[in-house]
Amino acid sequence: MNLMVVDASALVAYVRGHDDWSPVANRILEAHFAAGGGIRIPNIAVAELASAVARASGQPELGLQAVTHLARHRRIVTRTVDHGLASLAADIAATQLVRGCDAVYLAMAQDEGLPLLTFDHEQRLRAPEGVQTIPLD
């Protein structure tokens, strides 16, 4: 199966469906799923998704519904942030000057040799050498 790592910015755009990035997220991810692809996310993405959706809407139940939707998707697989991944993320955070959670997505992409889908411009610019980010056009 063709896989990619997807960060919270792309997940939120995909799940909410009405963000500025939603059309791009839908185009990329629906084409990926239609081609038999799957996505990998670190388990922290679940909390990031719930928080982003609930805060943006002001409705906690929408955040929880987004998590339920994510859990039911057969082509989305989570990975636990263990000591090894956390250590790699810490190294990336310090050397690339990226935020902590962003470093986790970059570390996962690097560790698994997978491309990363993100709408975070800084994260795309500061990705370590060898980490491919998926073009948005």
Identify the residue ranges that each predicted region occupies.
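Short, well-structured N-terminal submotif of metal-dependent ribonuclease cores
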Residues: 1-41, 56-65
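Short beta-strand scaffold positions
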Residues: 6, 40-41, 80, 100-103, ...
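Alpha-helix capping/helix-boundary segments
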Residues: 10, 45, 84-85, 105, ...
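Acidic, PIN/NYN-like endoribonuclease modules and their adjacent C-terminal/linker elements
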Residues: 3, 78-79, 106-137
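Acidic catalytic patch
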Residues: 17, 43-44, 64-95
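Noncatalytic, solvent-exposed loop/strand surfaces
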Residues: 16, 23-28, 51-54, 64-66, ...
